[in-house]
Amino acid sequence: MTKNLLEQLREMTVVVADTGDIQAIEKFTPRDATTNPSLITAAAKMPEYQEIVDQTLLQAKKDAGAGASKGQIVSLAFDRLAVSFGLKILQIIPGRVSTEVDARLSYDTEATITKARELIAQYKAAGIGPERVLIKIASTWEGIKAAEILEKEGIHCNLTLLFGLHQAIACAEAGITLISPFVGRILDWYKKETGRDSYPSAEDPGVISVTTIYNYYKKFGYTTEVMGASFRNIGEITELAGSDLLTISPGLLGELQATIGELPRKLDPAKAATLDIEKISIDKATFDKMHAADRMAYDKLDEGIKGFTKALEELETLLAERLARLEVVASH
């Protein structure tokens, strides 16, 4: 009997759940899980997770001490909420959870390093070692440099919002643990740019981008793992079968599970080793030049940081409203 696509994918690629929804993670039993500001905000709005939100707020209020302003309490709770979700997720997965640094720090190396250390300290205080956490940082030059320093301290990083080969090479040269090249968002850009409704999966610009990055890494023996992310359909996923990891939303995990058929391996280190690829080295000037020349990567990195910032601001508003409600309840 032919296995479903998800079972076959798991034989060649580590399957990761891209969600903050703990029930969805329990359903699909991935090895790892990834969260981002948008996913944490979405989960924080779900009725089944109000208890996590409330507990985090009440603990933050207690720790902030008497006389702390609402803003200070919300700020403290905000930092802790992603870790609260991460801790719950780590109870049900055997591997690692990715927790994102505040996207508003994406162009500030020092602030990113400080925030990453704080997140790791919170996990450590809850009994979780750094080997089970990936700190997610946007793939700006400043973010990559922050991650390079963090990796030397034993803090493992997942460089996200990655759209171009220049970003990927800079990450590999910096010794980053893992990158998340985005597939669907690249497709979105090209569809808008060309006016096309769709692309065959093998010609999908996002698929081509991740394939190029994977082949480059394997050709030159980089240890940085490639985790394709941001999928719009299962065709994009099946075209990247064989990638080190793929992080997939619950909806698409369900679709893969419900689909029976053969799944051939598309990405293969042995095949990559035979390719004729030019090796390039990336310093800041080269990075800036290549980034400016790659309009898609330039647009999508900027848009991604703005999108995550908007989600963070929405979460802060949500926490402030929730705190006010808890205080009203406490005063009665």
Curated annotation (Swiss-Prot):
Gene3D superfamilies in the record: Aldolase class I
One GO term of the biological process aspect: pentose-phosphate shunt
One Gene Ontology molecular-function label: transaldolase activity
A cellular component annotation (GO) from this entry: cytoplasm
Name of the top EC class for this enzyme: transferase
CDD domains membership: Transaldolase_TalAB
Subcellular location: Cytoplasm
Pathway the protein takes part in: Carbohydrate degradation; pentose phosphate pathway; D-glyceraldehyde 3-phosphate and beta-D-fructose 6-phosphate from D-ribose 5-phosphate and D-xylulose 5-phosphate (non-oxidative stage): step 2/3
Record-linked InterPro entries: Aldolase_TIM, TAL/FSA, Transaldolase_1, Transaldolase_AS
Catalytic activity: D-sedoheptulose 7-phosphate + D-glyceraldehyde 3-phosphate = D-erythrose 4-phosphate + beta-D-fructose 6-phosphate
Active-site residue list: 136 (schiff-base intermediate with substrate)
Keywords, sorted A to Z: Cytoplasm, Pentose shunt, Schiff base, Transferase
EC number from the UniProt entry: 2.2.1.2
Stored NCBIfam families: PRK12309.1, talAB
Similarity comment: family membership: Belongs to the transaldolase family. Type 1 subfamily.
HAMAP family per UniProt: Transaldolase_1 (MF_00492)
Protein name (Swiss-Prot/TrEMBL): Transaldolase
UniProt organism field: Trichormus variabilis (strain ATCC 29413 / PCC 7937)
